[in-house]
Design a protein with these regions (language model features):
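Catalytic Tyr-X3-Lys loop
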Residues: 1-10, 27, 51, 93
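C-terminal helical subdomain
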Residues: 7, 11, 70, 85-117, ...
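Active-site helix of classical SDR
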Residues: 13, 47, 55
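Alpha-helical segment proximal to the catalytic Tyr-Lys
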Residues: 18, 60-64, 115
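Active-site loop immediately N-terminal to the catalytic Tyr-X3-Lys motif
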Residues: 23, 36-42, 94, 112
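Residue(s) in the substrate-gating loop at a strand-loop-helix junction
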Residues: 31
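Short C-terminal tail/terminal secondary-structure segment
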Residues: 36, 107, 118-143
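A glycine/serine/threonine-rich, flexible loop-to-helix segment
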Residues: 63, 70-92, 96, 131-143
Length: 143
């Protein structure tokens, strides 16, 4: 996972650097798993965290040459299978992400509108990583 997830993007940037045009933008794809884990997912989580770290390091190394950002998607529907019911309802936005949600952010980050954004990792997960999960706990009630 580390060779593909971290070494490959690093080597590609090194190889392609002479060909970057003015205003170049690099968008790496990480995962919301860069900050969350499940048992037996150490290699994947480390690779995704590595992409996040590589992104901010490259943003400094390539300053004035290219802007470098990353996106960390959460659950994204990538097939004809639709996630609904509990899968969708557990997200604060009440749906699972779509490929278009990621594509639109990539287009934005590559545009001049994002000209002052570099070194950032943008999590696109419908708020899932912000949701605290406690069973039988409704939080604090304002009275």
């Amino acid at each position: 996972a580390l060779r593909v997830g971290v070494t490959a993007p690093f080597m590609l940037v090194k190889l392609l650097k002479p060909y970057f045009n003015e205003g170049a933008s690099i968008v790496n794809i990480s995962s919301s798993r860069d900050a969350m884990s499940q048992a037996q997912s150490e290699s994947y989580t480390a690779a995704k965290g590595g992409i996040h770290a590589l992104t901010h390091a490259l943003a400094i190394s390539l300053a004035g040459i290219a802007r470098v950002n990353s996106i960390s998607p959460g659950w994204i529907e990538t097939t004809d299978k639709k996630y609904d019911g509990p899968d969708a309802l557990q997200h604060p936005v009440k749906r699972v992400g779509r490929c278009e949600d990621i594509a639109e952010m990539i287009l934005f980050l590559c545009s001049e509108k994002a000209g002052f954004i570099t070194g950032e990792n943008i999590k696109i997960d419908g708020g899932m990583s912000k949701l605290m999960i406690y069973h039988d706990e409704d939080g604090w009630k304002y009275q």
